[in-house]
Amino acid sequence: MKISGAVLLAVVAVTPAAAVDKKATKFAEGLKNLDLETRLEQICDYEAMRRIGRDGKEFRPDRSQSNAVSEPKHEGSMLIANGAAFRSKGQWYRFSFTCKGAPDHLSVVSFAYQIGEQIPEAKWEEYGLWK
């Protein structure tokens, strides 16, 4: 099921701005087909890309994985991801985040993150990352 969710996230992440509203609606509709844990991971990964891209000019995330280095911890509507990774300009970076979703896991209520080090390309395969 996570692969399907990753595909949904990828469609929204690489879409031109003119089509974002339509793709975002399609993304939200697709989320309803996922189990609650996967849905929470998807909305939190999407929020991570949005926030990191918005908060500075250094990064332009096009992918985010809450479970890249280690599995995230689910606590109801809260997702704690200490082993997350995001891709920006062809490079992967470690980061951690805490994300609280709405009860239906279709939107984010609160989100905080911290960016870590760049992940060496030699580690990408080990973490399931790609170019």
List each model region and its residues.
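Sec-dependent signal peptide recognition
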Residues: M1-L8
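N-terminal signal peptide c-region/cleavage motif recognized by signal peptidases
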Residues: V12-A17
